[in-house]
Structures are given as structure tokens and as C-alpha cells.
């Protein structure tokens, strides 16, 4: 997998900009090397967030019910998602529990009194705010460099104005052990609804489409957090005029038997446009981003029927999705993804 230096992006180094261009047009993802002071701060943030993840999931069940993500706003960017309420991989229920923190309530002064979260969040609010701010800085840099490298107009940056309310959030995911006999399995194959997703994980499980073989490949985690994985989503494709390739991915149990017996934790920073940003989808239809976001999240929540197996790109499905994924990426007849 291609690696791009955070320091190189800051400096505008030609090698890293070229690698970013290739990742945008061909692969849909890259590893961000945390090799500068800003990157080292992100590494420290991830260490803190990993410890916070375990603390937040120790929240008593009655409190989790109070802060259920479906009760806390139409965008579903805050609160707890229980295990197994959506479709997972391989025709099973999903295999993860999730807690979400909204960026607006941490970074925008106009929203800071609206935060609804368990006491653990308020106990660490200052540190969580710092972490969110550092993630935001990294994402703004990546979007700026993509805009420059692809000679895009200002639409991408204008849709991610940091002073305006967005649908960006930080997700904490916990995957309990999932043996073959489990009724739960990872996460259904999909593209992310937003623009970027910045990931750190404690073990294998995430799979992406290898642009050379056009088949699933595991993404190796980085235990020392020297790299973060960056994936591109639907809105980066839309706001680049269809040029950027979104990353189709899924989560299944690790192929390492020892890891399958343990609990997996993942941090996911979901970069999404401003609530009122206007995007144009693959069909040429214009959407206010907040409405598009709710539409796709609603698709994830709907039970999938056998007759819906070809509903790409909304919901590629587990073991049935490879033909549709190739069609979606323009690869059914060997056409380059670029």
C-alpha cells in the first residue's frame, strides 16, 4: 500500500504529491506516515483515544440506552450503536458496537453547549477536543493537496469550511470475538458516505479492494501508530467531478486465529461535508449534503432482500458483491479505475 509522508504533504514535496494523486485516481486509499511534529501529536492522540475507547464502552447499559445514536439527531453522529442491529459481512448481522462523538459540539463555539454524551466524555472533554482539532488539521491538509494536485476548483474546500457546521464525527468501534459459529460478522462491504475516513485499528479485519488483483486484501494495522490509514469516500468522488476513486471496503474476522479470539478496537475519523453543502451524485442529481447523508445511512439500516443484490453503489453485499464492485469501479471489462 502506498505511504505518504505527513511532513511531505506539509512541505508540498513532489514525491508525496504524486503518490497522493495516484492514490486518488487509482487506489482510493493510502497510509499517512506520522513523521513530523504534527504527526507525532496525532500518534499521542491515538494512544489516548485507544484507552478512552475501553473506558467509554464500560458505560453501563442503561446509560448506553439513554445515549442511543438514533435518539440524538437526524445525522446519527453522536451516541452508541448497539451490536448486531445492521447487516454485516457474509450474510450475518454486523459484528461491532460503536460510540460516536460529533465534531460540531467539540470545535464550534456555537454548538459546544449542545453536546449530549456520558460523563466520561465530559471528564476528558479538553483532551478529546484537542484530538478532534488535530484530526481536522490533517484532513484539511489532505483536501487542500488533493485540490491542488488534481487542479480542482474550490468546491471541495468550500464544502468543508471548518467554521460551518458539518456532519464530521469521530467513531470508536469495538468488535467482540467472532468465531465461525457467531451470528455476527464484521461490517458489510460499502463505500463511506463522506469524504475521508482516517483509521487506526488494533488487529486485522479491514479489507479493501486491491487495484491490481481486483479482489479483497487485508490491511495490516500499525501497533505503534506510526501510520494511519486514509480512505476516500463518496463525497470526494462527487466533489472532484468523478475523478477520485472511493474505497470499497468491508470488515471480517482476522485471518489470524489468535486475533479472532480477542476483541478488536478501531478508531475512525469520518470527514464529511458541511451540513448545507451542495453535492452532485453519480446521476447528476444535486443534494444538500445533510439530506444525502441521511439517505445513505437509511440504506444501511434497511433489511436487505435477496432481490436487492445488485443495488450498487448504495450497498454492495458480502459474498455477492465482487461482480457489482467491478462494475461500479468500471473494471468489469478491464477498464482502468483512473
UniProtKB/Swiss-Prot annotation:
Residues reported in the UniProt entry to bind Fe cation? 190, 192, 249
Question: Which keywords fit this entry according to its UniProt record?
Answer: Iron, Metal-binding, Oxidoreductase
Q: Does the keyword Coiled coil apply?
A: no
Q: In which pathway does it act?
A: Antifungal biosynthesis
> What are the required cofactors?
Fe(2+)
- Binding-site list for 2-oxoglutarate: 264
Q: Which GO terms describe its molecular function?
A: metal ion binding; oxidoreductase activity
EC number(s) from the headed UniProt entry = 1.14.-.-
Q: Which PROSITE patterns match?
A: FE2OG_OXY
Say yes or no: keyword Amino-acid biosynthesis present.
no
To which protein family does this belong?
A: Belongs to the iron/ascorbate-dependent oxidoreductase family.
Q: What is this protein called?
A: 2-oxoglutarate-dependent dioxygenase ecdG
